Swiss-Prot record:
Keyword Heme found: no
Physiological role: Protein S19 forms a complex with S13 that binds strongly to the 16S ribosomal RNA.
Gene that encodes it: rpsS
One GO term of the biological process aspect: ribosomal small subunit assembly
UniProt-recorded Gene Ontology molecular function terms: rRNA binding; structural constituent of ribosome
InterPro entries reported for this sequence: Ribosomal_uS19, Ribosomal_uS19_bac-type, Ribosomal_uS19_CS, Ribosomal_uS19_SF
Native organism: Stutzerimonas stutzeri (strain A1501)
Keyword Isomerase (UniProt): no
Pfam families: Ribosomal_S19 (PF00203)
NCBIfam families, A to Z: rpsS_bact
Keywords: Ribonucleoprotein, Ribosomal protein, RNA-binding, rRNA-binding
Protein name: Small ribosomal subunit protein uS19
Length: 91
């Protein structure tokens, strides 16, 4: 269920400060964050944000289509290795 419009978008304050500093300096370095729950704002477009997936930081280049989504949607936490082949079926 989406967040109420009267509440506004959620973004962690420490991430917002890092993003504003990167925009102000015109810094191309990735902004490292553990905040997967923060929403992508229009001022983040063009920045590279390194989102933690539980093991490493995945670089995410923010585009206009991503605005309104959460950062965690773009850094998968699970790796799918396919289904194991059935040994009986190979005979």
């Amino acid at each position: 269920m989406p967040r109420s419009l009267k509440k506004g978008p959620f973004i962690d304050l420490h991430l917002l400060k890092k993003v504003e500093a990167a925009v102000e300096k015109n810094d191309r370095k990735p902004v490292k964050t553990w905040s997967r729950r923060s929403m992508i704002l229009p001022q983040m477009v063009g920045l590279t944000i390194a989102v933690h997936n539980g093991r490493q930081h995945v670089p995410v280049l923010v585009s206009e289509d991503m605005v309104g989504h959460k950062l965690g949607e773009f850094a998968a936490t699970r790796t799918y290795r396919g289904h194991v082949a059935d040994k009986k079926g190979k005979r």
